[in-house]
Amino acid sequence: MDLEMDIPFHCRKNEFLIHNQFDLQNISNCEVIIGNIIISEFDYPIITFSNLEKLLGNLTILKSPDTVRIDAPIMELISGTFKMIELTSLALISFPALKWVNTLHWKILPILSNVHFNNEIKGIDNIIISDTSLTGFSGFLAESIENLDINNNRFLDTIESNVETISGELHIGANSNDVKVSFPKLKQIGLLNINDVEKLNLPELEFIDDSLILNNNNFQQLKFSKLNYIGGTLSLFENLGVNDLEFPNLNELGGGLVMINNSLIERINFFPKLKIIGGALELIGNIKEISLKNLKLVKGSAIVKSTSSIFDCKKWSKTEIMLVVRGGRIECTDSNNEKITSRTKEDGTGGELITTPTTTTTTKTNSKSTYSGGRSGGNDDVKMNKETTSSSSGCCGGNVFVNGLQHFTLFQFIAILITLVNSFVLPL
């Protein structure tokens, strides 16, 4: 941003290090500052920027336990990052004229409950708000941001934004148990990671570049009406209250489909158009029915563990799942802990089912055997096969006969000779 004006020398330098009122007074008449302001271990309750309108740099305020209030009545612009960290007594900040800031990075502000900002702030790319006492988050006009991370704000019950694109990550977690999240215009996002949320409203979301992670949430309904692609994994873990899921247009997952211990989800029939799962399929819980009618390809394994007595592993393992899994095995464990496994073939022609009962016995094998072909008996069988193989050349298997003679005594040999002589002489 080009500002054509003369800026006094004392208002221009790389860093302005401020620890007390005297340091702050040195820049009190600056309307524009070029450089980074760093306030640490400030020894007064109130920090005031009376005349500052534009800061071409970062504003960092940290580790100042005495500070309870920060005022900037006419500040319009912070071109870089507005960072506040470890201000344990801060209760209020007031920037009523602020219209532009690039990054908000607020952490460990445990009693901050009042923020007075202009409702038309633009230019924000990254927002991190963690460990505050804020009750709401809204009011930013950016159509596109890179990252939004709102976590560990124990009183925060409303998160709203009209942002349309988040190129990086949206992470929400460990805020109030009844927090309601609404992004009514969001269409595309990189990574979506939502935890501990009561309501989630994303009616326009169509495309997720990375993964969709929904863990430990309190919502009952979850609808992604327009979502058609997830580039990574779809993970739903221990969302104990959800009983109504809708993914009517989801066509492809670049990663796996993982659903674990979502107690009220008994029938997995809400992916009517899903064709491709680029990773593994893993379903664990009180599952009574699995219906993935349009599924054509699973590039990983398929693992199902059901605690419902209604679910029939044998029946499910013989369905079309045999033809679509390419990544290794199909494994299904029922409520009796009986496991059925199958090795699948890459050409989609199915595989052999193997049933493993609840209790299994271990067969002891002879570890001394080193022969890998022919019969699979003990050492005697292996030795015989080796002798037979080594004597297979030449006439009549002579070596076998010689080896056999080694086991006869002299008297047995004489008796055999007499018998042979008599057989030739007597006919004469």
Where are the model-predicted features located?
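Cleavable C-terminal sorting propeptides in eukaryotic secreted/cell-surface proteins
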Residues: 397-428
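Intrinsically disordered, low-complexity polar segments enriched in Ser/Thr/Pro and acidic
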Residues: 1-5, 256, 365
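Concave beta-strand-loop units of leucine-rich repeat
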Residues: 10-26, 33-48, 56-112, 116-135, ...
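N-terminal signal peptide
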Residues: 1-13, 421-428
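C-terminal low-complexity, Ser/Thr- and acidic/Pro-rich disordered "stalk" regions positioned immediately N-terminal
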Residues: 328-400
